[in-house]
Each structure stands twice: as C-alpha cells, then as structure tokens.
Amino acid sequence: GDVLSDEQEGEFQSWLQAGGGWLGIHSAGDDSHSEWQWYTDNLIGAAFTAHIMGPQFQNATVVMENQAHPVLLDVPDTWQHEEEWYSWEQSPRVEGFTILASLDEASYNPVQKFMDYERDLRMGDHPVVWANCVGDGRSVYAAMGHKAESFEQPVFRQLILNALSWLIYAEACPFLPE
C-alpha cells in the first residue's frame, strides 16, 4: 500500500537528490511501493515479482561483483546466506545500477511452490545487492535481511556497515575506483 503521502514522497525524493543517502533492506524491494514509480525506477530498478516458496528460506551462494566498491570492503568474494530470496522482472543492471553482489542460482532452488502451483523464479542475472546515484545522493539496496538471524551473520553485518559508511561519508557518486 501507500506508506507515504504524496507530499512525503516529494520531500524524500528532494532530500535524496540533494545529497541524501538511502539504505533499503529486504522488503524495501517488494511490491508494497508499486504505486510510487519514482521509488521503483531510482532505488530498486526493477519490479518485484515473487520470493521463493519451497522452502521459503534457503541457503544460497552470494557472489561479489564489484570488489573495488567501498560497500564490499572486507567482504569475501563469495559467501553463504540463508534468505527468502526475491526475484524481479529484470535485473536492475539493465537500468544502469551498479551491481555489487548476485546469487549463484545453481546453489539453491529458485521456485515458488504453493499447493499445486509452481513457478520458476530464475532470472539468469540475479543481483541481490546494488547501488545507484540519484542526483547528488546515493542509494544501496540489499535483498537480504528478512530474518533477525541475518544481522547476526558477520559478513552481512560488514556489508551493512560498509553501506552506511559509504552513504554517509562518500564525497562523490558514482564511485570511481582509483
């Protein structure tokens, strides 16, 4: 549903474009904001389609893609994470977002099962962490974090701390490696 009023959406958009920083975690990328197209276009980059069900939470291999980015400082090249994995209509890479991490779709069962219904949620290119420049502001989205246990995992905590640091202290967007 509509979480913010039109006025609040406009204020948030202006603040972010003027140099603010936004960190979206897990459900920030679902379809609860689908009526706010600016949000989808600038922060998520793709429309949510579904999450896995069968089982709902699965271990998968997360593969880093842009190790030079400050959000990935001290994050290993690959790591295992249990999550309710999301899928989107397309990869946000198509819209020019900086992809920081993707899923190895061979490492889990990307399907949605419910009674006799089964839907394949493979994307081929399946990002789960990405960044974007929005005017003079920055955004990072991580599709992980459904369960509290995610925040007990040292690698995920490091990624979130790095993201917050980049969002607060970065002087320029886009990030250009030295």
Regions found by a protein language model. Name each.
Residues 2-74:
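A glycine-rich, often tryptophan-bearing local segment used as a flexible ligand/cofactor-contacting loop or short
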Residues 15, 22, 36-38, 79, ...:
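A residue-identity detector for tryptophan
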Residues 16, 21-26, 72-73, 98-101, ...:
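Structural recognition of the beta-strand scaffold that forms the well-ordered cores
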Residues 23, 50, 82, 171-175:
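Secondary-structure transition/capping residues
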Residues 39-45, 81, 90-97, 145, ...:
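Oxidoreductase and adenylate-handling cofactor-binding alpha/beta cores
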Residues 54-135:
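Catalytic beta-strand/loop cores that center a nucleophilic Ser/Cys/Thr
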Residues 106-178:
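Extracellular ligand-binding/catalytic regions of CAZymes and related secreted enzymes
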